[in-house]
């Protein structure tokens, strides 16, 4: 015997889990009934439902024929929704016997079908490129990592050990170089100090020379004054020499006279 089907009371379900289950089932049933009504009566329907939980990812659940936006916009404007069907869906075309009109409708449908297939190919190509690019990159990275680890397990370990020993030797050499650099720093310090000393000595020599120059200038001034005195003495000597010349000329002239007198006496 089949069990008796228990009816659910039409009131708010307090428990969250049964409420969510009931919402999901009855929403799908409502959409199914609305789609049947649209097909049977050519009605345009829009259904908007809020989710049960406030933490849901979806803000609204909607169903519409021909579209929710078209029906809601027509409702807000208080107008009949625009007919968005294709022109060949008109009932008058089904009863038409005009071959040219039917041929035009078939051409329009074939063109639309060809465009839809082209768009579908482009969509599939884009999805394949988006799917395969990350996968191929990931595979390449994994292969590269495995190759590196495989090689590192055998040869690169020995190289790492030898590199460590070489690094230890290099560290020792670096310590010696540091000591040499310390010695060079001391040498540079002594050289710079000696250069500063030589510069200071040269400055002292310059000051001494300047002082000596002042003394030499005073000596030169005194020598100039002495020379002036000597020049005065020389002038006096020249005057004396002039007097002597006169005396000598006088004596020579007197001797010449005496000689002439003696010759006359003879």
Curated annotation (Swiss-Prot):
Domain annotation MADS-box: ranges: 3-63
Alphabetized GO MF terms: cis-regulatory region sequence-specific DNA binding; DNA-binding transcription factor activity; DNA-binding transcription factor activity, RNA polymerase II-specific; protein dimerization activity
Keyword Ribonucleoprotein (UniProt): no
GO CC terms of this entry: nucleus
Places the protein is found: Nucleus
SUPFAM superfamilies in the cross-refs: SRF-like
Domain of life the protein comes from: Eukaryota
GO biological process: positive regulation of transcription by RNA polymerase II
Stated role: Putative transcription factor.
Subunit structure as annotated in this protein's UniProt entry: Interacts with AGL27 and AGL62.
PANTHER family hit by this protein: AGAMOUS-LIKE 83-RELATED, MADS BOX PROTEIN
This protein's name: Agamous-like MADS-box protein AGL97
Gene: AGL97
